[in-house]
């Protein structure tokens, strides 16, 4: 098993051997097993030397046409539709660019689920067969990409990187925050009202509480 093999490899390094951790394609440990071996190496005071190489995540991002200053990588989504949509719903308000891997036999369903959850106009970049002869990278809306997959403008072959535009950040004005807090304060204690207002508006609880105190003194 993984723990036993990790121990064996660590012992071989301690005994003077050199171990290289590689993958079939791309950069090792990016959506691949093996991080426990690296962790064990650090715990045993063994030097870890990374060798830069190609990564589908970074390669696709660099050519995506979407913001690259802030992004999150979520690997493969669940193969089960209900679990997949539930997970996507947790990312509705995520403002960072979203990066996923997807298999060809699930790509159409995944794009359709993303369209249902994020809306048809959210932009997405589909990248497949990266660095290969039939590489294809397409930037469009989720609804347009869905159609292009159906009519095979985007070929459903090879592994896919799916990059989704983050949600637009919206800021709630102080006036709106105070209004929400005032309504809640009619039935709840100041601290409870501030806590709920924080969850509704995204404003920090302490800031809401202080704003309410100042408003009450005017």
Positions of PLM-derived features:
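Short gly/pro/ser/thr-enriched loop/turn and capping motifs at secondary-structure boundaries
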Residues: 28, 55-58, 132-133
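Helical mechanochemical/support elements of P-loop NTPase systems and associated helical scaffolds
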Residues: 5, 26, 33, 56, ...
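Conserved RecA-like P-loop NTPase ATPase core
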Residues: 21, 73, 103
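General beta-strand structural signal in soluble alpha/beta enzymes
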Residues: 23, 50-53, 100, 126
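Class I S-adenosyl-L-methionine
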Residues: 1-50
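A contiguous loop/helix-start segment that scaffolds small-molecule binding in enzyme catalytic cores
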Residues: 14-18, 97, 104-218
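Class I SAM-dependent methyltransferase SAM-binding "motif I" and its flanking Rossmann-like core
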Residues: 36-94
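Short hydrophobic/charged patches on amphipathic alpha-helices used for structural packing
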Residues: 7-10, 88-89, 182
